[in-house]
Amino acid sequence: NQEKANWFELLKTAPKAFWTVTLVQFFCWFAFQYMWTYSAGAIAENVWQTTDASSVGYQEAGNWYGVLAAVQSIAAVICSFILAKVPNKYHKAGYFGCLALGALGFFSVFFISNQYALVLSYTLIGIAWAGIITYPLTIVTNALSGKHMGTYLGLFNGSICMPQIVASLLSFILFPMLGSHQATMFLVAGAVLLLGAFSVCLIKETHGE
């Protein structure tokens, strides 16, 4: 009980940046949960025109998603090196830009029916991923003093798992509501990630609160 009380006390006194970055993270991880869940099905629908998971086309779509996931990872690695060179005063602009480009990538998946054009979509998504793995911890750790750093970072991990749980639960409502089309879920993901991009504007970077 004492440990729980200490956690609540730490949360009450957490720097504002902790909460605003957590809000951005919520939207980001929510959106990416839908990408991981619906990519193969969306590609099968749009490119191979099939929803039959046992069909050859669906298997080819799954294989192509494996290629696109590699493209996304490579784009994220390259972009991460670039972001590491960006001065601190441009953190928010870089964070916003990465997420906005990722939202564009999500939206484009809904419209694209050419498998090779999807390379651009997943490159943009990779840029968003670079922002997600680069900026949040940097901004939060800058805002914290050394005291309770480990505990705060442990609590911050909740901003990763909770949105994925919420997204998964909401999909039971959203998916049938949107006609049970997996590609349509990318419009939801894009809209949510765009909310994350604009939420970056709420972040006020501080140092050692």
Q: Where are these predicted regions, by residue range?
A:
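C-terminal ends and interior cores of transmembrane alpha-helices
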Residues: 101-113
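Intracellular juxtamembrane helix-capping segments at the cytosolic ends
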Residues: 131-145
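Helix-to-loop junctions at the C-terminal end of transmembrane segments
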Residues: 78-91, 175
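Loop-to-transmembrane helix entry
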Residues: 49-73, 184
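A membrane-interface helix-boundary motif in multi-pass transporters
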Residues: 173-193
